[in-house]
Amino acid sequence: MISAQKALERMVSPSAKVSAHWCIDEDGTIYKIVPENLRAWHAGISWWRGRRDLNDVSIGIEIVNPGHEFGYRPFTPPQMNSLVNLCQEILKRNPIHPLNVVAHSDIAPDRKKDPGELFDWSRLARKGIGIWPNSIKTSPWHRPLKLNDHNSEVKLWQSKLAELGYGLVQDGIYGENTELVVMAFQRHYRQARIDGVIDHGTSNILDHLIEYAKAL
């Protein structure tokens, strides 16, 4: 949303059919919009770890930023401070698995890009919120996989993305859906390179996260 005022106006309007439980302005102000025990309209058509329509089982936080369409910019320090504090309080009230701390783009990669590649997921992970790749071991080299590839290697990496939680068909065809899922993964975990290609760097991070998640 371009501003907190526009975000709040939209999220309290019944006709908009869009809402979240919380909203954080660029100055760090936190607004409570919907009680956490009630369903908000923030996830939309979505999928994560075998579940559809995540509005029923998730807590949504809107962080004010113009976004990619209107001048995307880094999130402010007051916003991030407030977000860390809010998330830590939410986690005290709700037993949320670290893998289930996700971006809108993770659960709806064909529709959404937020919060995007300027969002500091590593900071949240250092505070016990979600996961982040650290101490990455190098996986065996493979040639980059990209749009229109069709082979068993594609199917292998599709299955790994699905194991982490993403929703995609595991058919060995590197179609548009797979490319969008890879870009969503990169926006979250490899923000310096968002090209939809599974190269050595992206595959290393994915392998690391899968192994890390198994230990949680």
What are the residue ranges of the model-derived segments?
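Active-site-adjacent loop/helix surface patches within enzyme catalytic domains
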Residues: 1-99
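A charge-rich, low-complexity, intrinsically flexible signal that marks solvent-exposed coils, linkers
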Residues: 48, 114-117
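Short acidic, glycine/serine/threonine-rich helix-capping segments at coil-helix boundaries
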Residues: 144-216
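A generic structural signal for short coil/turn motifs at secondary-structure boundaries
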Residues: 69-73, 109-111, 169, 193
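Structured segments of extracytoplasmic/periplasmic soluble domains
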Residues: 11-14, 36, 86-94, 126-130, ...
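Acidic, His- and aromatic-enriched active-site or binding-groove loops in soluble protein domains
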Residues: 23, 117-140
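Short, function-defining helix-loop hinge/capping sites that tune catalysis or transport
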Residues: 70, 112-114, 183, 207
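Acidic/histidine-rich, metal-coordinating catalytic segments
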Residues: 96-111
